[in-house]
Amino acid sequence: MNIKLFKKVFLKIKKLFKPADKFTYVAMGDSTVEGIGSSGPKKTFPALVFASIKQEFKHAKLHNLGRGGAKISDVISSQLGSAIQLKPDLVTISVGANDLRNRTKLKQFRNDLSQLIEVLKRKTDAKVIVNNIPDLSHLPSIPFVFRIYSKILLKRFNQIIQEQTHKSQVILVDLYSQSKLFANKYPEFISSDGLHPSDTGYALWANTIITQIKHLFLNKQQIKTQF
């Protein structure tokens, strides 16, 4: 038998015998994934999402690869390889804010996002969820003079995220509309640094993602939200 064919058949058979309560969740992205602004690791949005997954999959594992300051090129170079090796069932991607701040070319961002999603789809069996960039224009840490400019550019980045997720047939979570709705009325959703979400903000973020996960994997009657 051809070695490549044998390996392919072996992996399929191995997957059939995977215990039903095992589940691997990999979170990729920037400081929002790492949880900057939260009061601790258990209050990050990946940890809150994982807590809901754990209700259904007792032996589930979370691997949080998020790093502060990461642009999409950093996610590809520093996180993608690890994510593939972990053989995830679910991958969430939160990236783009640092590309906006560091003026990554829109064409480059588009190409990198397409590459990131397509490699994950090709080399893993994971369901992929990508969130767009929350509205940054109302954040206290953003100088007023830059708010209009950032809002215009943000819409362009989010348009790319929408187009690429649709093209690649992965799930888009719309955090932009949600953050725009709450930014002015609920300042407690923003942490003391004036930039990142607070515990409450991350809980709201997590619930938006959990809603999507329920439709993909979980028993809707048993899974509880985190906020």
Predicted regions and their residues:
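Short beta->alpha linker loops
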Residues: R67-A70, S177
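Serine-esterase "nucleophile elbow" of acetyl-processing enzymes
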Residues: N2-G68, L80-K87
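Active-site micro-motifs of SAM-dependent methyltransferase domains
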Residues: V33-E34, Q55, G69, D99, ...
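Residue-level signal for threonine
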Residues: T44, K71, S198
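Short gly/ser/thr-rich secondary-structure transition/capping motifs
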Residues: K7-L11, S73-S77, N111
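Conserved donor sugar-nucleotide recognition element shared by glycan-biosynthetic enzymes
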Residues: K42, I72, L154-F157
